[in-house]
């Protein structure tokens, strides 16, 4: 079992060093990480621990990765990897640094 911040500082799958929490939703937490093999930043989406035994949700999570991996467009992040290790289901994708959609909404609302 893990808590969101407990992955920070850990290395996932001997490859992705988890640096910080980027955001969290009902299903998953997204982290900024560094891929040690390719020396680049990536985003790692990890299925919440409380959902790890929900087989339907795990299947949905994996299908999300497969569907997104088939897409190629400048406005869609690329999927680099997907997997499960020690009960953690994860998707590794392109990391985009910048302002979030939530922040844009707050600015526009002012």
Predicted feature locations:
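A short, low-complexity linker immediately N-terminal to eukaryotic Hanks-type protein kinase catalytic domains
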Residues: 2-18
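Protein kinase glycine-rich loop
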Residues: 18-25, 30
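Flexible N-lobe loop architecture of eukaryotic-like protein kinase catalytic domains
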Residues: 23, 63, 72-75, 88, ...
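Conserved N-lobe loop of protein kinases adjacent to the ATP-binding glycine-rich P-loop
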Residues: 34-41
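AlphaC helix of the eukaryotic protein kinase fold
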Residues: 48-70
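Activation-segment/catalytic-loop signature of the eukaryotic protein kinase fold
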Residues: 82
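Conserved short submotifs of the Hanks-type protein kinase catalytic core
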Residues: 86-100, 104
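Activation segment of protein kinase catalytic domains, centered on the conserved DFG
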Residues: 106-110
